[in-house]
Amino acid sequence: MQETDRDIHISDGTMNKEEQSPNNEEMVEAFRNLLLLHGHLPDKHGDHNTLRRFLKMRDFDLEKSKEAFLNYMKWRVDYKVDLISQKFKFEEYGEVKKHYPHGFHKVDKTGRPIYIERLGMTDLNAFLKATTIERYVNYHIKEQEKTMSLRYPACSIASDKHVSSTTTILDVSGVGMSNFSKPARSLFMEIQKIDSNYYPETLHRLFVVNASSGFRMLWLALKTFLDARTLAKVQVLGPNYLGELLEAIEPSNLPTFLGGNCTCSDHGGCLFSDEGPWNDPGIKEKIEEPSTIEDAHSETMDKVSENAPANQKESLGEVMITMEKYAALKTAVKDSQKRIEMLEISLHETKKVLNGLAEIIEAIQPNQPITKCKPV
């Protein structure tokens, strides 16, 4: 029986334009100022795109975004993420991919990287013999760091526009409730927690293909672990999925096992190739120049701001004025606190002098009691 029903639909929309709207861009600047005022803006990982992701994660609520961002920075320190990114070696990479086929492969029509998993071909027992959940999580973190620092910037340069999210395809042929064992649940929940809390807003859309009736029961369980924003990006398809994929991806960028034309035979298969703009030597050289992406982004945002409606510009001005007033008030409060501290010190010293004089006078006139200053 052919499955053509879809549990959840997503709209094509214009997410990239929404991300770059003047209101959102000014909110990023306000968020940066808020973190700076409290001494929470780090030298690393506090870039424009990261701040915007955490704002979107919390619907542009500054205080909630700040809390989420500070949790992220604490996690990076506690989990030693920078060390994992630089030093962790996943020697079992090839063996793991045999039992859990997955990987990045080229880009979609919008220039976003494509990530693919063939869950129906996963052999969990063999996977757990090849590695541990802890080591795989470290590998996943290292891959996420590579995506943030290399894949997205490379795709941005190649497509000449800002790219900060991924198009994902999950092939669930043959997957059902029996696949959702305790180890599978542990791995899924750990990966989901990391991605949703520390790498938010990096999913553009998710195609679940070859979904059978048996997958529906599993999907009901999986949905409980996903937030509404993620669910809105998911499209569950049966075996007649190809038309939907080809609307988003060129056949030359789609592996043959999904109905496309690509085999990556020189790399042992598409999921072993990691093929994409991030392997272009010229693009990688540009990424090493810190100004490249930021300059392109600033130029784009200048154009967006110039074309903003008058009412939007007024509201943006109000946001910035509010932040400036907040900053001025914060400075005034700190200055007042310092003055109060100085007055308290001066008053304390004055009372010490008066008490000393009282003792001298009492020594000179022992028969006349003198009341000393009470301690502060």
Swiss-Prot record:
Record-annotated CRAL-TRIO domain positions: 92-266
Chain positions covered by the region annotation Disordered: 1-24
Coiled-coil stretches noted in the UniProt entry, renumbered to this chain: 323-357
One GO CC term on file: Golgi membrane
Cell location: Golgi apparatus membrane; Cell membrane
InterPro entries from the UniProt entry: CRAL-TRIO_dom (IPR001251), CRAL-TRIO_dom_sf (IPR036865), CRAL/TRIO_N_dom (IPR011074), CRAL/TRIO_N_dom_sf (IPR036273), PI/PC_transfer (IPR051026)
SUPFAM superfamilies (UniProt xref): CRAL/TRIO domain (SSF52087), CRAL/TRIO N-terminal domain (SSF46938)
One GO BP: protein transport
Alphabetical UniProt keywords: Cell membrane, Coiled coil, Golgi apparatus, Membrane, Protein transport, Transport
Extent of Basic and acidic residues compositional bias: 1-20
Membrane topology note: Peripheral membrane protein
Protein family membership: Belongs to the SFH family.
Name recorded for this polypeptide: Phosphatidylinositol/phosphatidylcholine transfer protein SFH11
Species of provenance: Arabidopsis thaliana
